[in-house]
């Protein structure tokens, strides 16, 4: 697809919506991730007013956001189908801006945890963006569209921590929250001005359907429960190493740089390969089917974790994690394209709201599982556990391929395919 084609400015052109949402996703990803590097340090600076241990509160600032997002995302998804997906994109960015701005005025670590919980309740930008793009992109281009959104979030999450760390060093922690809120408000303006969404008359009937009925309908679509299981496994696999990688790198000898710098390099390189591969594998999914791409990427990723059990030098984990990033770049947008193809037109909000809740559940559980495996067995055993998770994802995808043929792209007909 040529760039000049993507930049067609007609109001009803899906490519224009995709380009606007791509930049909005990039901006919001930078904004949300600027606070990641120093949140535990900010917790220590604020201190506790209730006597709770700072180690517990440092973990709670992450888990609280994931928990509330898991609980509220399905409701936001249904509301998106009823009242418009553009409105939900604006709501998610504005809600994130308000909650993060308030964090600059927190007076205790407990207040910060509550505000992070509020952020989880009000935000959910990625799922809102996915639902909007899935509702307008033609079936044959869903893989490309989801790949582009993955690129936007990948670049944003790679740049954000670097920007946040520099601002925190130069101007203090609280300034970062002001900058983040400003970036999210810019995304709000970008979507308000640049995105045009026309309400489909056929969707009005869904406004009288109860939340539970909408969710039941979504789960009853052939293949959707399997797609959600894939999302949970992918989220679990993606986040399992988060508490382990820094500790494992410290255990390696003869590093050419500090452990902190090398940890950042490993994470950054993996994110970079994920971002680059997402666009190419997304386009490939449009041609051969998202199931096939997810299957191959999951199986290869599973195999790549086996040699990581035997790593003895830093360059080895750097190389293998870079290759893992390529696989993840095909899995994440591939599952989004698969889900878009399995859900009916007009139900994208509900489908991706549930999807975001399941992803948040995986993010919440993964660090606990990774830590438990490390305690019960060893740090190296976590790599094998990760390989098993991706192997299960590959087996499940293979079962989907055998059960139902199709390319997993979104369609505008009554019978779901994918």
Give residue spans per PLM region.
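Short amphipathic helix-loop junctions that connect adjacent transmembrane helices
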Residues: 38-55, 244-261
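Helix-loop junctions on the cytosolic side of multi-pass membrane transporters
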Residues: 188-205, 399-410
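Conserved MFS/SLC helix-loop-helix module at the cytosolic interface between two early adjacent transmembrane helices
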Residues: 71-107, 285-291
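Central cavity-lining transmembrane alpha-helices of secondary-active solute carriers
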Residues: 60-76, 268-280
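Symmetry-related core transmembrane helices of the 12-TM Major Facilitator Superfamily/SLC fold
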Residues: 176-192, 383-399
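Juxtamembrane intracellular "pre-TM" segments in multi-pass secondary transporters
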Residues: 2-14, 197-229, 415-418
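Cytoplasmic helix-loop-helix junction between adjacent transmembrane helices
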Residues: 115-153, 338
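Hydrophobic core of transmembrane alpha-helices in multi-pass small-molecule transporters
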Residues: 99, 111-124, 316-330
């Amino acid at each position: 697809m040529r760039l000049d084609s993507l930049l067609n400015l007609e109001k009803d052109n899906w490519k224009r919506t995709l380009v606007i949402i791509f930049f909005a996703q990039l901006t919001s990803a930078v904004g949300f991730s600027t606070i990641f590097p120093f949140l535990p340090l900010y917790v220590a600076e604020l201190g506790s007013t209730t006597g709770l241990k700072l180690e517990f509160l440092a973990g709670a600032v992450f888990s609280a956001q994931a928990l509330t997002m898991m609980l509220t995302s399905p409701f936001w998804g249904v509301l998106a189908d009823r009242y418009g997906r553009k409105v939900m994109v604006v709501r998610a960015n504005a809600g994130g801006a308000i909650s993060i701005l308030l964090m600059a005025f927190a007076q205790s670590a407990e207040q910060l945890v509550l505000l992070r919980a509020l952020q989880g309740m009000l935000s959910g930008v990625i799922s809102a963006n996915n639902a909007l793009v899935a509702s307008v992109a033609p079936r044959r281009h869903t893989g490309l569209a989801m790949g582009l959104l993955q690129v936007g979030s990948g670049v944003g999450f790679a740049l954000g921590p670097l920007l946040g760390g520099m601002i925190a060093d130069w101007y203090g922690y609280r300034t970062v929250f002001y900058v983040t809120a400003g970036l999210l408000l810019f995304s709000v303006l970008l979507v308000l001005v640049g995105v045009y969404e026309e309400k489909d008359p056929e969707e009005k009937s869904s406004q009288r359907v109860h939340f539970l009925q909408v969710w039941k309908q979504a789960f009853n679509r052939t293949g959707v429960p399997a797609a959600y299981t894939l999302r949970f496994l992918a989220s679990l696999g993606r986040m399992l190493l988060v508490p382990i990688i820094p500790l494992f790198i410290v255990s390696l000898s003869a590093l050419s740089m500090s452990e902190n710098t090398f940890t950042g390099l490993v994470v950054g390189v993996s994110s970079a390969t994920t971002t680059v591969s997402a666009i190419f594998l997304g386009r490939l999914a449009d041609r051969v089917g998202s199931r096939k791409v997810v299957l191959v990427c999951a199986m290869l990723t599973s195999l790549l974790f086996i040699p990581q059990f035997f790593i003895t030098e830093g360059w080895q984990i750097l190389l293998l994690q870079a290759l893992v990033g390529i696989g993840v770049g095909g899995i994440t947008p591939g599952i989004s394209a698969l889900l878009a193809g399995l859900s009916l037109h007009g139900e994208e909000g509900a489908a991706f709201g549930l999807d975001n809740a399941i992803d948040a559940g995986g993010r919440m559980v993964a660090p606990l599982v990774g830590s438990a495996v490390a305690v019960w067995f060893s740090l190296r055993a976590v790599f094998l556990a990760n390989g098993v998770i991706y192997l299960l994802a590959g087996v499940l995808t293979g079962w989907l391929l055998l059960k139902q043929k199709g390319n997993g792209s979104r369609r505008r007909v009554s019978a779901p395919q994918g």
